[in-house]
């Protein structure tokens, strides 16, 4: 399968690390490196399993995390344990990474604040100097806000893979039949149009074959990017539901 999807929501490895820190409710000043490294590598592995274009900077960050983890696991010399001067001068291997994360979080928050201000400003119109109502056009502002991130979608897909792995029999017959992304997109759209109600994310993965699971997930991302479906999540880390947009039902 030679299909690749580029997702704009992937802003870089620091963005992924912040997502994991928030998800796991970790103190950014005291990061458990072993745990965060495991979760980070799982996400990168999932991206590569989906044949997404994983930028080299993600792999560099993975190597950095592994390096920090190994440095923290190295045993200290016995004489160093009682050397107060050594303890004062010893640097935390996580220090540089923590500083980068805090700096990135600050700029990310500022960028989000500016974006929200821009959206609010677009909803306001200055009073015209004269009556131009005859020439005014009605402008419909879009109120749709995507609250579900690609990282949330990846997390949901990981649950699908884990559940299918548990339910899969010990011996399976692998089918090499390739499924075009466009065909699976059409199937999902038809399913949403016929149901006329929201569907649970898991409902779109009825088959066990890995190829079919990957194609289905990529099809969902494409439909999401093209605003043909609406992704809903009541609160963080809850179940994800999918409904067809007006564009689907009006077609």
Curated annotation (Swiss-Prot):
UniProt function note: Participates in chromosomal partition during cell division. May act via the formation of a condensin-like complex containing Smc and ScpB that pull DNA away from mid-cell into both cell halves.
Keyword Cell division on entry: yes
Gene Ontology CC entries for this record: cytoplasm
Protein name (Swiss-Prot/TrEMBL): Segregation and condensation protein A
Gene3D superfamilies given in the database record: 6.10.250.2410, Structural maintenance of chromosome 1. Chain E (1.10.10.580)
Subunit structure: Component of a cohesin-like complex composed of ScpA, ScpB and the Smc homodimer, in which ScpA and ScpB bind to the head domain of Smc. The presence of the three proteins is required for the association of the complex with DNA.
Top-level lineage group: Bacteria
GO biological process: cell division; chromosome segregation; DNA replication
One family name in Pfam for this protein: SMC_ScpA
Protein's organism: Bacillus licheniformis (strain ATCC 14580 / DSM 13 / JCM 2505 / CCUG 7422 / NBRC 12200 / NCIMB 9375 / NCTC 10341 / NRRL NRS-1264 / Gibson 46)
Family, per entry: Belongs to the ScpA family.
Gene: scpA
């Amino acid at each position: 399968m030679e299909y690749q999807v580029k997702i704009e929501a992937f802003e870089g490895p620091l963005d992924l690390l912040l997502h994991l820190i928030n998800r796991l409710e970790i103190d950014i000043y005291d990061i458990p490196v072993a745990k965060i490294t495991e979760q980070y590598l799982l996400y990168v592995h999932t991206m590569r399993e989906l044949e997404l274009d994983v930028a080299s900077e993600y792999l560099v960050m993975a190597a950095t995390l592994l390096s920090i983890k190994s440095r923290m696991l190295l045993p200290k010399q016995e004489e160093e344990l009682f050397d107060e001067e050594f303890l004062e001068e010893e640097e935390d291997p996580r220090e540089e990474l923590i500083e980068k994360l805090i700096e990135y979080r600050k700029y990310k928050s500022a960028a989000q604040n500016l974006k929200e201000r821009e959206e609010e400003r677009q909803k306001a119109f200055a009073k015209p100097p004269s009556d131009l109502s005859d020439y005014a056009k009605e402008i419909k502002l879009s109120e749709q806000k995507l609250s579900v991130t690609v990282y949330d979608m990846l997390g949901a897909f990981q649950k699908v893979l884990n559940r299918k792995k548990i339910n899969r029999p010990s011996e399976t017959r692998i089918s090499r039949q390739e499924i075009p992304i466009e065909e699976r997109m059409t199937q999902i759209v038809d399913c949403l149009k016929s149901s006329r109600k929201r569907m649970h994310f898991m409902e779109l993965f009825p088959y066990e074959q890995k190829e079919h699971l990957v194609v289905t997930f990529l099809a969902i991302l494409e439909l999401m990017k093209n605003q043909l479906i609406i992704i809903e999540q009541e609160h963080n880390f809850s179940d994800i539901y999918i409904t067809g947009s007006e564009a689907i039902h009006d077609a």
